[in-house]
Amino acid sequence: MAKFPEAEARLLNVKICMHCNARNAIRATTCRKCGYKNLRPKNKERKA
């Protein structure tokens, strides 16, 4: 997807809030926008 590994890491190493879909830091425990605690890692593989 990205042209070089640093860019790909920057795009994919995030967590997504299950409540508001905000992008959060990989080390986050709560969402920065809504405070929700249920965060999932961003999917690394693209869907077919």
From Swiss-Prot:
Keywords: Ribonucleoprotein, Ribosomal protein
Lineage: Archaea, Methanobacteriati, Methanobacteriota, Stenosarchaea group, Methanomicrobia
Protein name: Large ribosomal subunit protein eL40
Assigned protein family: Belongs to the eukaryotic ribosomal protein eL40 family.
Gene Ontology cellular-component terms listed: ribonucleoprotein complex; ribosome
Molecular function via GO: structural constituent of ribosome
Transmembrane intervals: none
One Gene Ontology term from the biological process aspect of the record: translation
